């Protein structure tokens, strides 16, 4: 497939996705039946179906497959007067950054896909970026990220800090009843949590608050007890916890902070950047009641 056609199909899929979103908002569920296609185009879907990030990424696979089915039912993607049916190949990134790069190469070189929908963590994206740039293929990246990066081969669809963490930090500063407005930052140990928290530290200082502690866990490590002990020591009278833990680390974290009395009833409020419906159903809503999350629409 020519690079020019790949780019136009890439744009066509984006337009088709937007059209479906607008249709859904309008409540019109009519789709074309018995569609006749002139050709097919295959795309890749590359997320973690196993490992620590599967709790978040497996739902993305289901959502992307559903969107492709809806686009096909609505007539597919039209480029230069030809209708293309979208087919997909699913690969497992296995919560391992080198695997994301290897699977990207496989999808592009062996399966000849022009576009891949993939990744979650910034670590996975940064592992994949050289692959897409060197092969002039395209990656749809679906989640918030730390910004400070721009590539002609990546379509960044998630929020940047000025759209997520900065307004969330201001909200939590204003909400916190604790004297001195103390914050504790906890995250998974990779680029997004560390970069996001660097921005947060500067913002908290400008607002007049204090970052009293900061700690990180290697992604996949669920030994959260030492961090919880540090939070209790640094915030004896309550305060704000900015949480950038990812994957199944959040299951252990929220169950154990409740056991430790780190709850809204005791003046502790957690702001989360990577918890949505999928994680809530696994963690249990009773462990998250009274805490907060910030996402772009």
Task: Give the location of each predicted region.
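Solvent-exposed loop/turn segments at secondary-structure junctions
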Residues: 49-52, 93-97, 121-125, 144-149, ...
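Short beta-strand segments enriched in small/hydrophobic residues
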Residues: 40-61, 119, 182-187
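Extracellular/periplasmic Venus flytrap/periplasmic-binding protein
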Residues: 102, 153-260
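Short, low-complexity disordered leader/linker segments with a strong preference
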Residues: 1-42, 73
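Periplasmic-binding protein-like
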Residues: 45, 107-120, 140-142, 182-187, ...
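Beta-alpha junction/loop-to-helix N-cap segments that form part of ligand/metal-binding clefts
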Residues: 28-34, 55-62, 77-149, 157, ...
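Signal peptide-proximal N-terminal region
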Residues: 41, 62-87, 178, 205-209
């Amino acid at each position: 497939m020519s690079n020019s056609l790949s780019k136009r199909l890439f744009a066509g899929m984006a337009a088709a996705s937007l059209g479906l979103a607008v249709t859904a908002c309008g409540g019109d569920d009519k789709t074309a039946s018995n569609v006749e296609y002139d050709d097919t185009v295959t795309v890749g879907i590359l997320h973690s179906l196993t490992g620590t990030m599967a709790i978040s990424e497996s739902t993305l696979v289901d959502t992307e497959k559903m969107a492709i089915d809806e686009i096909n039912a609505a007539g597919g993607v039209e480029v230069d007067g030809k209708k293309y049916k979208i087919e997909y190949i699913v690969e497992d990134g296995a919560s391992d950054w080198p695997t994301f790069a290897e699977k990207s190469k496989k999808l592009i070189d062996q399966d000849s896909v022009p576009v891949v929908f993939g990744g979650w963590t910034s670590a996975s994206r940064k592992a994949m970026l050289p692959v897409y740039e060197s092969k002039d293929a395209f990656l749809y990246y679906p989640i918030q990220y730390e910004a400070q990066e721009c590539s002609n081969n990546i379509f960044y669809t998630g929020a940047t800090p000025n759209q997520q963490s900065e307004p969330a930090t201001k909200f939590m500063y204003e909400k916190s009843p604790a004297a001195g407005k103390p914050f504790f930052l906890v995250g998974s140990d990779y680029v997004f949590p560390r970069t996001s928290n660097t921005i947060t530290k500067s913002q908290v200082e400008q607002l007049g608050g204090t970052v009293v502690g900061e700690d990180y866990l290697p992604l996949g490590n669920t030994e959260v007890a030492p961090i919880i002990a540090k939070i209790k020591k640094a915030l004896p009278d309550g305060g704000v916890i900015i949480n950038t833990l990812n994957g199944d680390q959040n299951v252990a974290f929220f169950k154990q902070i409740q056991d430790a009395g780190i709850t809204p009833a005791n003046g502790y409020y957690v702001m989360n950047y990577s918890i949505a419906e999928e994680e809530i159903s696994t963690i249990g809503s009773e462990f998250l009641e009274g805490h907060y999350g910030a996402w772009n629409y």
